[in-house]
Amino acid sequence: MQIKLKNIGIIKDSMISLDGLTVITGKNNSGKTTVGKVIYSLFDAVANIQRKARSDKCYYVERQLEDLDSILEFFRYFRILMREEENNIFANYPAIQWWLSGEYRRELSLETMEISVHKFIDELMELDTAFLANYMYSSKRYVRISKLGSSIDNLKDTLEEQKEKAISLLQKVIVDINKDPELIDYARESINQTLKVEFSNQIQPVKAPNCKSEIELSDTDTVYFHCGIENNNVINDGTPIFMSSPCKNVYFIDDPFILDDVGFRRFYRGSIAEGETFFNANRISSHNTKLKAILRSQKKLSVFEQNVLGDALKEMQRKIDTILPGTFEFSPEGNYYVQGETKLKISNLATGSKMFSIIKMLLNIGEINSTTMLILDEPEAHLHPMWQNAFAEIMVLLVKELNVNILLTTHSPNFMLALDAYMRKYHIAEKTNFYQTDSIENGFVQYTCVNDDMGKIYQDFLQYLSEVKMLRNSYIGEIEE
């Protein structure tokens, strides 16, 4: 498959192949990471999209039901009666009781919640507000009734008005959650918000904010994603921008220190921060937040899954175990790397070990397989050349043995050479592509494929090595004199 970027970040107009191992080299601040951010945003935005949509819709319904408190204001009186276990006048209205008791907050199924809302509407329509008014008025327990005057009719009219407003809101809720059955708008907005999070709201070139920007991911005759961008937002012209996704999950690894903050936490439904609403960008997680959540999940592969994945997975695990043989333990007492009888706090683990740790943990919980896109930004940064070689071999083997798609950036000549060497050793040249970022006019950059001219990459590295070598030699000469 190929991804085409036009006026995204500082990338002018480039196409990159993603058919196994894709390596991007170039100077600092040359847009190497841009394509990774885009690919992550596209794949993550639509991963498990049906489940995400149901979850969002459940959350939306829950918030609307909470808002009914301010509409059905006088129903607070009946909630008090229910708590005091007095005569429940809603005994024959189970859906109203479902709302009054707050039981809807424990509802996990969108289908069940929708059925309950329908029943709630029906019961409100049947509800005799005159009877309620008489009941409330005669009990003389509701202090605010006195403010309505002495007429029961005033109370009945108020209850009737509140009931009609509630019915109207609930009917709108039903319409809203049944809109967009193909999730065309949902996918567009999810992609839009994920791009905005990953690019900090600067998807388009800062120097040319009014230019036309495009993203397209395709493969031969299939277009997976195609979207235009204006004013740092995905254009909404009613056209679907997402057709299907070639990857089930995606991980973007650019910070080994996230292991220090993985933690052991319990999450409860309904714990989303106050003020968040349907399609709120605050509910779109950054790639690091998502990765931490996956790593702390501590799920394990079943025996069946291990058997299906077979020898290839075991070989990957053996390779990593030669570098990092221990296991990981996350608990309320702390997070540890455990090797034999020794327990080392993960925060004290060598930085280079943390990059291997992340890959090992993802493999162990079954999150790296043939449906995975793995994006790594300068993974060699904290690795000794010996471990750079080992890491490069593992990356190549993930592509060869598990058919993982990997996109990585580097500016290390040793790591680049290691990837080049292992790519040839394990015969995956046809699944490997090398790119270099080249500066063009007006501060823009383009990706250039250098598969047929690998010397260009090494020449770039060698230039700066030669410069400091000559500088060093000049001072050695001065010292000898």
Task: Indicate residue ranges for each PLM-predicted region.
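Phosphate-coordinating catalytic segments in nucleotide- and nucleic-acid-processing enzymes
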Residues: 45-371, 448-481
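Switch/communication elements of ASCE P-loop NTPase nucleotide-binding domains
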Residues: 1-49, 335-469, 476-477
